[in-house]
């Protein structure tokens, strides 16, 4: 069987809405081979994930086969889900990237990244999850008339990334619906300033700037109704020494950057989220992953 390992991703970093993405040390793994019929075996997180041809990985695999001029042959798929779905950690992106790489590996076809991205964007319109899942590391993405432009940048190795993952889901579509169609110029300027500051702080390792750099007025204030206790959790994280705290992707997961006290920060956030939402939450401490998707044959 061919094994495909795809990293989870976190995006936005507060001010970098639909722009910043980071590959993480947590992965989903997809093992595939040709078969007489489609067989899907799910391990790990499995609730709500189809075990037939409606499975996102299978749909992307079939589309990729068509794109490279190959007839989609049935697959046996073993899908090991370690990335919690619908939590703002790029679980869908892992399936999309995995499905593309599976079709290419099984048919021994190579495609440039630009062509892979064209297929991926048919399933996921926003590049901030997809691109770091392909290339790894910290990425800055921009869309243009000619396609997506991105730059991969180094992410500091001494920063630990604390995730507090509530036991409830927020779909991307739901998180998009609560956003306004228009924003005031001063709010757009607020985010432009801080997103530039964030990149500068990372590259120079001037971590004291990160707290201000992740402040946001474009999406988090509107998504707070979907994540009860978000503002309170951010405040308590700073009391425990966090460098920066924000929603991971569309949420409900909360992400905190730190160089120390990671367990205390995670537990403090977890207690606040549990108090305000009524749901428990899981704490994970991860690192940035410089590698993107890996294919083992």
From Swiss-Prot:
Annotated Pfam families: GHMP_kinases_C (PF08544), GHMP_kinases_N (PF00288)
InterPro entries: GHMP_kinase_C_dom, GHMP_kinase_C_sf, GHMP_kinase_N_dom, GHMP_knse_ATP-bd_CS, Homoserine_kinase, Ribosomal_Su5_D2-typ_SF, Ribsml_uS5_D2-typ_fold_subgr
Gene3D superfamilies in alphabetical order: 3.30.230.10, GHMP kinase, C-terminal domain (3.30.70.890)
Keyword field contains Nucleotide-binding: yes
Xref: PROSITE patterns: GHMP_KINASES_ATP (PS00627)
Record pathway: Amino-acid biosynthesis; L-threonine biosynthesis; L-threonine from L-aspartate: step 4/5
GO biological process: threonine biosynthetic process
Name of the protein in question: Homoserine kinase
Primary site of residence: cytoplasm
GO cellular component terms, A-Z: cytoplasm
Protein family (similarity comment): Belongs to the GHMP kinase family. Homoserine kinase subfamily.
């Amino acid at each position: 069987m061919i094994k495909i390992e795809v990293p989870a991703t976190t995006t936005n970093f507060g001010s970098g809405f639909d722009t910043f993405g980071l590959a993480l040390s947590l992965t989903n793994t997809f093992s595939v081979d040709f078969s007489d019929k489609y067989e899907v075996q799910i391990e790990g997180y499995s609730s709500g994930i189809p075990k037939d041809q409606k499975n996102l990985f299978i749909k992307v695999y079939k589309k990729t086969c068509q794109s490279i001029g190959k007839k989609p042959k049935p697959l046996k798929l073993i899908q090991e889900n370690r990335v919690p779905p619908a939590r703002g950690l790029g679980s869908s992106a892992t399936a999309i990237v995995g499905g593309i790489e599976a079709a290419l590996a099984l048919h021994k076809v190579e495609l440039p990244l630009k062509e892979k991205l064209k297929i991926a964007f048919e399933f996921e319109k926003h590049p901030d999850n997809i691109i770091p899942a392909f290339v790894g590391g910290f990425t800055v993405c921009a869309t243009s008339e000619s396609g997506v432009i991105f730059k991969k940048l180094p992410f500091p190795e001494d920063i630990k990334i604390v995730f507090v993952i509530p036991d409830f889901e927020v779909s991307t579509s739901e998180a998009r619906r609560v956003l306004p169609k228009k924003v005031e110029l001063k709010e757009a300027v607020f985010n432009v300033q801080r997103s530039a500051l964030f990149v500068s702080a990372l590259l120079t390792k001037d971590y004291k700037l990160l707290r201000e750099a992740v402040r946001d007025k474009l999406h988090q204030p509107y998504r707070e109704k979907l994540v009860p206790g978000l503002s309170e959790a951010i405040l308590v994280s700073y009391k425990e020494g966090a460098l920066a705290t924000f929603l991971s992707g569309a949420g409900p997961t909360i992400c905190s950057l730190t160089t120390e006290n990671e367990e205390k920060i995670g537990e403090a956030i977890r207690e606040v989220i549990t108090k305000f939402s009524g749901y428990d939450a899981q704490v994970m401490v991860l690192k940035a992953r410089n590698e993107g998707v890996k294919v083992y044959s």
